[in-house]
Amino acid sequence: MKNITIILNREFASYFTTPVAYVFILVFLVLSSAFTFYLGQFYERGQADLLPFFNFHPWLYLFLVPAVSMRLWSEERASGSIELLLTLPITLWDAILGKFLAAWLFTGLALLGTFPLWLSVNYLGEPDNGAIAASYVGSWFMAGAFLAVGCCLSALTKSQIVAFILTGTVCLLLVLAGFPLVLNFFQDWVPALILDLIAGLSVIAHFMAISKGVLALTDVIYFIAMIGLWLTLTRLALQAKAAD
């Protein structure tokens, strides 16, 4: 646990040694506000809630989360420092969890910056604060799942651009999995069991369920399982690299 904390602190601090972190947070806040108040027609709806705000999160994360995760291991591989890291007296899990948790906390910090929106809707009306709180939790878990995907894919390549594209593509597939258009495409030529599996992989389905204000165990388990699966795949990728 001590090694994880050391790596977490080092990685988290490294985000703020360049302007990139501040640019990321600023872009996230600006786009979140723009999508909420303009594309989401916040005022026209006449309802004191943050539904338009959270509806755009999966699409925002498709671009912003890969921008964070692409450097997690690609940077280490490109600089050659990954060989040094793998020889240190720490376990692979220490390094993986330390890096992942630092990135997850960083995205959580960006999400925390949107809390004034929550205060605004409380000023304008009487929203369902339980549903909003659950939506924040769901959004953070969704970001964590996308980061875990990015963590794995960045371990496969030295190029941050390639890692960005691969992560965005895989996350897009996870978002689209539950869309009726996608399910209708598959329903004529795959068994119902496979169709249910495809629908069950949908990030949006689980996120929207949480956004209704109900933190169902199945939805929480889904995100935890996604994170665990992709971090395990990260470990396998790094083990293969160490064996080269």
Residues covered by each model-derived region:
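Transmembrane helix segments
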Residues: 40, 157-210
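Long, hydrophobic alpha-helical segments
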Residues: 54-75
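Hydrophobic alpha-helical transmembrane segments of multi-pass membrane transport/permease proteins
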Residues: 19-39, 58-65, 169-175, 229
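Aromatic- and glycine-rich beta-strand/loop motifs that create alpha-glucan
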Residues: 1-22
